[in-house]
Amino acid sequence: MAQEWYKVDNVAKVFLATNTRRDPRVFRISCTLQEQIDPELLNEALRVTAPEWPQFQVTLHRGLFWHYFESTDQLPTCHPEDKAPCAPLYVPERRNRLIYRVTYFGSRINLEMFHALTDGNGGFLFLKSIVRNYLALVHPAEMQDVPTPNSASAAALEQDSFRNFYGATKREGKAPKLPNAYHLRGKRLPYDQLQFFEGHLSTKEVLARAHELGVSLTSYLGASLMLAIYAEMPALERSKPIAISLPVNLRNYYPVSYTHLTLPTIL
């Protein structure tokens, strides 16, 4: 078993502080295959994958002064998709359970994770491992030369890279005062309900358009969201700035294998 327990990092504390039933801080990543999912083989793939990612085989607890993760021998099991997407994972009725779930529907495998555990990139790598190990059981001959996405050691995956690379510096002078940003308006859903919209885009075409404009995919999608917000703004409020929060994957800038949270945001 990996390290028995460790404190959550500073970024994870934000998700713990803002976790509610309206916004349970759960994200989903899915993979759709070309054939129906075999639940027994998917469960076998999860049993193979879990030891490869010990940093995700944890439960979350509230200590006297801080939250902490504790390693567990629980093994993940898949279930048919029977809840709304991104249903809460860190709630009293799920105490002492893994803070991620794997479900399936037709030919699709869904991975949902509590955001204090990792970010989208860490979840994506975890799902790739699950899918790779599942396909190795379904099509062993075709998959025998396909390596697992996780090539780092358990120690490298668990190290807190914030401690290694962050250097505290004091700001010189006061931060500039920013004007109040525009706030979206609309009818609120009941407290414990979420609403989802599903869209399908060609990654190749969207990337080509972003590169044509000389920007990254994240910048292009962020700008598209801002334009959509602007189109809904009342004319009298269009002088207000539109502010959105974009995550930054620091793995692109630092040599780390850390799979917990490395996503400060920019406005």
Where in the sequence are the language-model features?
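Single conserved hydrophobic/aromatic residue that forms the stacking wall/gate
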Residues: 260-267
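Conserved helix-loop functional segments at active or binding sites
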Residues: 252
